[in-house]
Amino acid sequence: MKKIIIAIDSFKGCLTSAEAGKAAEKGIKSINPSCHTSVIPIADGGEGLLDVLITATKGKYITLSAHGPLMKMTKTHYGLSGNGRTAIIEMAAISGLPLVPIEQRNPMLTTTFGTGELIKDASNKGCRNFIIGIGGSATNDAGLGMLQALGFRFLDKSGHTLGTGGQIMEAVANIDTSGIHPALRETHFMVACDVANPFYGPDGAAYIFAQQKGADSNMVQRLDEGMQSLAEVIKKTTGKDITNYPGAGAAGGMGGGLLAFFNAELKPGTELLLKAIDFSEKIKGADLIITGEGKADRQTAMGKVPYGILKEAQKEHIPVIVLAGSIENLPELNKAGFKGIFSIAPGPITLEKAMEPEFAKENITRLVSQLYSVITSFG
């Protein structure tokens, strides 16, 4: 084998994508030090998106302070691509659920204001292209906080400016866009979104996601009704009906907020990232691709990282094998087109032991060395 591509998703809570990839590469090199291997860090639209794109574009991190979900100043960061033209933002880095103590989680109060501040900072630096991952949010404010940070004003029926949080949605009667940050009118947003939920309703933002952000049943109902009302005001203001747009309900309606007021596209995270790092070009001429993730199951064949890689590989007729900490629904995975799915576990072990980073690395290295020996023995 002349060229092997290694693109393994993070084993969440255990190994980063790069760590897993390097462990696999070590297994190959232990058998054939001269084999041409290429480790490509990879991610979906959530955890790891920023790090992967910074690495792929030879970009840099920008550190700053912005308002967290409860409007407390928080140190955070975003990324600039190597050419300085594209900003890469993980919404969770400033508006994420882990930033709110469990006892204070309340999507009536939490806001996306800080995400807007990151967008504004990058825009002031000349960025006119944005890649935004909107997973892991603590919010259900339809992106109104983000918009407020960018110069929008939301007014009640008496003309008073409203505050922040999901609680304001039900009171919005008019939207003043006159103070919008001027550069945003010529800015393009590519949004990594891995859910297709509509803006409101039984499958919408509030009913599906608000409870995990701290909402009780009464809050869920109020938030959903607020989003219904807000959708009408948005339609009146912009002419856009975002109600049933797939992904409009993502991140507490953040998807809808971006679609309503900006030149924004919502894309599955894996698809967006593979395109951004020019994955299709990187794999040309490869003899094998090794991918993987912490748990391979039926969701793997429904758009997760290994499946996205498989689709690209099939265009070039490159075989793909999957490494995973655990495996479920093996027949479905084989049917999807993977040439093999292998567990890195050496035998019966506790989850705690399996999640030890050094142990996981050793298991990946051991498995890949054995697989490489078998594959190459057939010429």
Per-region residue spans from a language model:
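N-terminal loops that bind phosphate or other acidic moieties
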Residues: 2-134, 138-379
